[in-house]
């Protein structure tokens, strides 16, 4: 488990290898995933699963107190999240958006809770009880989390940048409800056509994510006609036919996803997971 966590961090560092160390952003998505995986493994192998929901609550409560007492909802460098990150890592190693890095040190606390919720849901999914009973549990938990996030948002904004507790509730709740819907469609109703795409991305998620990052980096560093390949494709293809708007930006992202999907499908067909 520790090896997997280290591999995740190493892949992201290699992904940004073209930057000098003085400008290298130390936090990142893969580093966040690695840390969450690492601490979740430690917790779940040393604490009985019946105590994990209580631990999730405690972690989110502690983080909420830190946010309330440390200007945690201020969108600026005086935010406690920014203060800690800049003190430990330095401003040059952070994602510079008003001094707040969305994958910083302090916001890893609620991210661990996020991962622990996923662990608990996974345990329910692999239980041997009737699938309808499991579906009822998932639907109930998802609904409670979604409504809790909405109700608590009046005192704690739903904000990804600071990974607020309400953001954890809302995203987990929505994700669990979507999972419930897919279980009902695929496993209960036995409607499985058209869902292979989920399998293609699901069996190699880390590869697909990293490949997408590398493809994007290549697009913004390869030049064609005086522009980067990314700019050329957007201006001469997407914006030319669909206009310079949000829909074209969506098509740009989908184009990258399609390319990665083709590669992922090739790996899936060759049973390379």
Predicted regions and their residues:
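Single conserved hydrophobic/aromatic residue that forms the stacking wall/gate
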Residues: 1-8, 13, 273
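Kinked, hydrophobic transmembrane alpha-helices enriched for aromatic residues
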Residues: 8-16, 148-152, 202-224, 268
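Specific transmembrane alpha-helix
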Residues: 9, 31-44, 107-127, 145-156, ...
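Small-polar-interrupted transmembrane alpha-helices in polytopic inner-membrane proteins
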Residues: 9-14, 56-63, 137-153
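Membrane helical hairpin/interfacial module
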Residues: 9-25, 30-33, 37
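Long hydrophobic alpha-helical segments that form multi-pass transmembrane helix bundles
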Residues: 49-117
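Membrane-interface transmembrane-helix boundary segments in multi-pass integral membrane proteins
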Residues: 101-111, 160-176, 199-208, 226-261
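Functional transmembrane helices that form membrane-embedded active or gating regions
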Residues: 135-147, 165, 188-215
């Amino acid at each position: 488990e520790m090896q997997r966590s280290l591999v995740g961090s190493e892949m992201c560092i290699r992904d940004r290898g073209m930057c000098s160390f003085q400008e290298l952003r130390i936090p990142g998505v893969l580093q966040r995933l690695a840390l969450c995986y690492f601490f979740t493994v430690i917790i779940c192998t040393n604490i009985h699963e019946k105590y994990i929901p209580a631990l999730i609550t405690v972690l989110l409560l502690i983080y909420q107190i830190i946010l309330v007492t440390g200007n945690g909802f201020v969108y600026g460098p005086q935010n406690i999240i920014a203060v800690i990150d800049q003190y430990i890592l330095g401003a040059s190693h952070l994602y510079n958006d008003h001094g707040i890095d969305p994958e910083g040190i302090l916001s890893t606390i609620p991210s661990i809770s996020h991962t622990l919720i996923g662990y608990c849901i996974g345990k329910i999914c692999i239980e041997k009880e009737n699938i309808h009973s499991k579906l009822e549990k998932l639907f109930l938990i998802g609904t409670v989390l979604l409504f809790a996030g909405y109700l608590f948002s009046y005192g704690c904004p739903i904000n990804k940048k600071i990974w607020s507790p309400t953001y954890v509730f809302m995203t987990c709740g929505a994700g669990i409800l979507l999972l419930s819907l897919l279980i009902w469609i695929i496993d209960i109703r036995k409607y499985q056509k058209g869902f292979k795409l989920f399998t293609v991305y699901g069996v190699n998620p880390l590869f697909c994510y990293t490949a997408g990052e590398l493809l994007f980096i290549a697009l913004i560093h390869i030049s064609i006609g005086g522009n980067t390949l990314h700019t050329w494709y957007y201006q001469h293809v997407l914006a030319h036919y669909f206009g310079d708007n949000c829909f074209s930006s969506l098509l740009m992202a989908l184009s990258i996803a399609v390319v990665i999907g083709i590669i992922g499908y090739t790996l899936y067909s060759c049973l390379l997971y």
